[in-house]
């Protein structure tokens, strides 16, 4: 787990020299896109079983899990999913200038700077605005943002050229006590 790894680095005083933003490939997400519905997350053990690989080592051992992970990556059609990089959020943007905008071809992702309260993060005008991931133009909101949980908000937007889109805003909390979208 990348977050735990970075927490351990911090705890033991090891400098975090990962680039910012730190992009990585999430095996569970990519496996789901190649072998399932794109949403369901499978455990490493389940993926190994589904692919019919021999289970010749214990799970939950860093080296063994790395070997199993490599086997799955070797088997999958990586070219079909390599566009779906994940963005590590252990370190979040420090200010508006370093906020992250990433276009994945079928959706766009935004990671905000940190806010002191959940409400401030949820009310941020940039987070609540939405651009068309196809043409990049600002879209008009058709339905006001509404919450389904204390963390997740939805809205509907329209692009004059490309039609309607669902907007999703998820407020998260980091180890430094800040909230971000």
Question: Can you say where each PLM-predicted feature lies in the sequence?
Answer:
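DEDD superfamily 3′-5′ metal-dependent exonuclease/proofreading module
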Residues: 1-181
